[in-house]
Amino acid sequence: MSIDIPKLNDFNEYWLLVKNEVIKKLNSELNLWDDACKFSHSKFHQLIKKLDLLGEWPTTPMGKLKTNKETFELFDDYYPEIKKLKRIFNLLNASKLTEFAISEDARYRPYGGYKPFGTHTGRCTPSSKWIFGTAKWARSFIKPPFGCAMVNLDFKSQETFIAAVISGDEKMLASYKSGDFYMNTAILAGMAPTDATKETHPEIRKIWKTIVLATNYGQGARGMAKALKKFNKTYSEVAGLLMKYKEIYKTYFDWAEAKSNHAQVHGYISTSLGWDRHFPYAVPINPRSLMNWPVQSEAGEILRNALIRLLNANIKVCATVHDSFLIECQLPELNEQIRIAKQCMIDAGTYIVGAEGMQVDVEIHRGNFKPEPADQELFNLIFEEIEKYKTSQKLNQGQVTYPNKVRSI
């Protein structure tokens, strides 16, 4: 894919020189680092206490609160403060991020970083050598060449559609077709009126979104209760909501349990096209690891089938990213190529699961790739500091500078 080479070169040249200034700006709300960018464990302890997480936060053998990536990832989806904290730690450790392999034609080709079929579900293995596997703000280095646009085509709530169709759960399929699965589930649970929307009942929707996504990954009520504590939900209340969720979509959960039982008895589980997962004889199997396997694996089958269709239709595919494709289109052909690409993806879904109705979202990037707003803000902040540094050096005419070179991100 095409990369913004001037911006990449600026980052490589000036990042180490502006890193502390970026950290200070990000720290203005958290106030956990001093002017020398030294971390305060006592202030961090106060923050975790304020968030009411002291009883759940993992500690080191010496009794200190852990500050590693894995610990932050337990809480960052539910606490904005932890997400920002994780982002700062990532930047502090980034004297050198993963290398971009830039070819002679100034395009990025991830030799060794892109690993299809790397997981037991047949999905790609995440890798920091792959631009979509490293820091999300770095995606802003992706830039279409002159006269082109980059288009991200994403299967909308793909796993919900697959689960509804292959399990035969009509209620789940109706919720998917409503356009807002989380809100419709809240309505079915009696927690929102029939005319409720994302705008009128945002908190209720967030609660059910958390329950749905956590259940997809085999999480129980205790884990969900941690995430829903900020909505003043107790463990007992969350357990009740989880039970209600399983009652609403009873057909799906009965089917998923039957698939899990079959795998444990026979020692294997398969997709419709024959991607298998086999289990060693007489070795205990974690049932939770099987609950979402059929859905995830069928999603992988759809993605691969869609990729074949896109390439046969002469669509320029730059990347596959979980449930989406990044394609490059010439501007005069943009709308037509998007139409063809969407149809290829929809046809792939129909072919694999045997039912129509899969939806595809489209994002068009005519300039640099736009990640989530928080990640875009971070990218902008980094380059604001780089521009300030470059301007200050121009004003200091007699001063010689020796920029720290960083080979890549």
Please identify what each model-predicted range represents.
Residues 1-5, 152-155, 223-224, 317-330:
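Catalytic palm active-site di-aspartate
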Residues 1-137, 143, 147-149, 188, ...:
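Conserved "right-hand" nucleotidyltransferase catalytic core of DNA-directed polymerases
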Residues 48-51, 156-171, 189-190, 331-334:
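Short active-site loop/helix that positions an aromatic residue
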Residues 74, 97-105, 137-142, 152, ...:
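Short, contiguous acidic/charged loop-to-helix segments that flank catalytic cores in large enzymes
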Residues 111-112, 116, 189-316, 320, ...:
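Conserved catalytic core of nucleic-acid polymerases
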Residues 144-159, 215-220, 224:
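Conserved catalytic palm subdomain of right-hand nucleotidyl-transferase polymerases, strongest
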Residues 147-155, 205, 304, 340, ...:
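Catalytic phosphate/metal-binding cores of nucleic-acid and nucleotide-processing enzymes, i.e., regions
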Residues 313-362:
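C-terminal structured "cap/appendage" subdomains that terminate the fold
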